[in-house]
Each structure stands twice: as structure tokens, then as C-alpha cells.
């Protein structure tokens, strides 16, 4: 199950709001209807990681982003914490070969950890605003932090320095 949820979480990062992302989201919401709440927890965390990781990377790896990207980076904290994956799209569009793999790995790790920690979610959306509805919320936040920092670290390793 943890591997499967890691896959669903990774799918949330593949196209950042596109059809693969939506397929994972629909699977998560259908799981709620079926009474399986851990899949939705993994799906939501997978959608939260990319924008949070990008926001972190624009702070820790400033030389890997343009001035415009660094300025836009912190907005992704708010979007990520709100489960709005689409904040990561401009960053993924400008460097898909480096941004997407980093985000997919971070999301998959976060989702797998969420599942391994037994986290559940009965709400289909909401990010940090639905933390009170999350089963095992502390470990959910731990999984979110770990996945976000893994993706952030990979962004620092994979992205090339930007010359302005």
C-alpha cells in the first residue's frame, strides 16, 4: 500500500494540475467514498510537496533561479500549504527535465511516508486548513517536511546555475 500511495503521490507532480494529476486526485476522492482515507492523505501530500519544495529551493539555492523566479518562490509556500500544486507550473515549464523528477521523487517519498505512518484524510481538499481532519496529523506534517526537503535538495543538485 505504501508503494501504491507513493505512486499516487508522485502522479500529483508529473504534470502539476494536468490530466495525470487529476487522475490521481479522482482516485483519492473515490477512495474516500469507498471508506479508504489513507489514499487521499497520500494524494494531497503529493500535491503539496512541489510548490513547497520550489519555495524552499528558491531560498536555499538562489543561484539556481532567476531573480524573477526567486521573487515568485515564496508565493509557492502559500500555494503548497493550500494544496494548490499549480503554483509550481512556471518553474516546471522553464526547466522540466530537472524540476519534474525532483518533485515527483519528493512527492512519492512524502506519500509513501504518509501511508507508512498510517495517516488518513476524510476531506478531499484543503491543505493545512484540514489538518484537524487528518488522522495522525503530526506524522503527516513530518512526511510533508521530509518530502519537501528531499525535493528541494534534488532541485539544488539537478538544476544548473543561472547566469544573470
List the predicted regions and their residue ranges:
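Pore-lining transmembrane helices
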Residues: 7-163
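Short, small-residue-biased leader/transition segments that mark boundaries at the very start
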Residues: 1-6
Amino acid at each position: 500500500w505504501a508503494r501504491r500511495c507513493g505512486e499516487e503521490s508522485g502522479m500529483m507532480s508529473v504534470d502539476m494540475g494536468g490530466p495525470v494529476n487529476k487522475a490521481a486526485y479522482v482516485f483519492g476522492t473515490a477512495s474516500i467514498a469507498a471508506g479508504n482515507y489513507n489514499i487521499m492523505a497520500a494524494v494531497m501530500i503529493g500535491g503539496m510537496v512541489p510548490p513547497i519544495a520550489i519555495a524552499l529551493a528558491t531560498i536555499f539555492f538562489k543561484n539556481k533561479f532567476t531573480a524573477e523566479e526567486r521573487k515568485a518562490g515564496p508565493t509557492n509556500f502559500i500555494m503548497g500549504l493550500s494544496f494548490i500544486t499549480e503554483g509550481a507550473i512556471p518553474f516546471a515549464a522553464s526547466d522540466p527535465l530537472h524540476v519534474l523528477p525532483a518533485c515527483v521523487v519528493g512527492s512519492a517519498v512524502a506519500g509513501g511516508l504518509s501511508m507508512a505512518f498510517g495517516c488518513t484524510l476524510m476531506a478531499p481538499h484543503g491543505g493545512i486548513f484540514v489538518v484537524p481532519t487528518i488522522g495522525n496529523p503530526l506524522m503527516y506534517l513530518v512526511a510533508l517536511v521530509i518530502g519537501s526537503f528531499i525535493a528541494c535538495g534534488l532541485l539544488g543538485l539537478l538544476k544548473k546555475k543561472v547566469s544573470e
